[in-house]
């Protein structure tokens, strides 16, 4: 193997005393990404497993691909659909993305290639900036602390990118991922020591620091000078009837043929990747079930209460399921094993808390039509407390048993 031989040849330069000793973390990251780690356990009586942390993170990264590829197509489709109905908007477009799309494809909404290229012209730069800037911080902290670079950043980078609208400026992408990696993870010691989901920390920073680029009706479509509302915004204004009258059926929302963040629109694509996470037991099914229980119970309760002034009270649970970032947050964000509850009972409570909070924010709080991000971050804050009470209750039960 040419690559293996090359890596072995230059390895001594990165070891202790070598010319590039301080960059050993970067060398080790490339080496272990391409090949299995050289260090193995040689003592007896060890449990062997078919997956390690690196393979687990790579699998989570791969599970985002259905949502990623569909998101790129849908981003282009939504833009080309608008161009088809508004030729004057197409003539008024400019910029390097528009020129690149015109050189490689066209602007036909019925063309799979045209839509995919248009969407890729928006998503891939976002992902590239996220990976490069976030990777810089990962390498910097790993070099200073003299430890390996963890593959968890593969997951953080793609999750952060998929939660963003296509029109976000790239410099804001760099700001968001920097805040998420440095403040959300590294200041607490790095991978495994953070108590908040770093991808959501970065998005929350952008949401509050630059709300004009993360909310409203003008950010969800890759078309300059066009404003289009998401399903949740339409529901907040006119209920489910308002969503349907705007041309978005429940099936459209389930498939993801609507405006929204790049990777959060298609519940079907998210379920495909999420099913793999659940089958491989990377994602905790108790958390997913808990989120669903909390969401269904509270949304049904609001349906029974009703309201003459707030149409969101009448929004049924199956619309909450396909609207906004609920599916993506449930399967990819809430199930983060580091920032979620660790006890089995705690996972149920953690999930139910998130399900209740997301409906509460969506229905009652008029300032935030989408509540999944805030609900999960609130759940992250409560996770240690939940586990504490679960452990203490178990200790008391054991002590009472021995009395």
Curated annotation (Swiss-Prot):
Report the EC number(s), separated by commas if there are several. 7.2.1.1
Alphabetical GO biological process terms: respiratory electron transport chain; sodium ion transport; transmembrane transport
Broad class of the protein's primary localization: membrane
Q: Identify one Pfam family in the record.
A: NQR2_RnfD_RnfE
Catalytic activity annotation: a ubiquinone + n Na(+)(in) + NADH + H(+) = a ubiquinol + n Na(+)(out) + NAD(+)
| Protein's membrane topology | Multi-pass membrane protein
One GO cellular component term of this record is:
plasma membrane
The UniProt keyword set, sorted, is: Cell inner membrane, Cell membrane, Flavoprotein, FMN, Ion transport, Membrane, NAD, Phosphoprotein, Sodium, Sodium transport, Translocase, Transmembrane, Transmembrane helix, Transport, Ubiquinone
Transmembrane parts of this sequence:
56-76, 121-141, 164-184, 195-212, 237-257, 265-285, 287-307, 312-332, 348-368, 371-391
Residues bearing FMN phosphoryl threonine are 230
The cellular location(s) given in this protein's UniProt record come to: Cell inner membrane
Which domain of life does this protein belong to? Bacteria
Cofactor(s) essential for the protein: FMN
Question: Which PANTHER family does its entry note?
Answer: ELECTRON TRANSPORT COMPLEX PROTEIN RNFD, NA(+)-TRANSLOCATING NADH-QUINONE REDUCTASE SUBUNIT B
Family the UniProt entry places it in: Belongs to the NqrB/RnfD family.
Q: How does it assemble?
A: Composed of six subunits; NqrA, NqrB, NqrC, NqrD, NqrE and NqrF.
Name it.
Answer: Na(+)-translocating NADH-quinone reductase subunit B
Lineage of this protein's species? Bacteria, Pseudomonadati, Pseudomonadota, Gammaproteobacteria, Pseudomonadales
Q: Its encoding gene is what?
A: nqrB
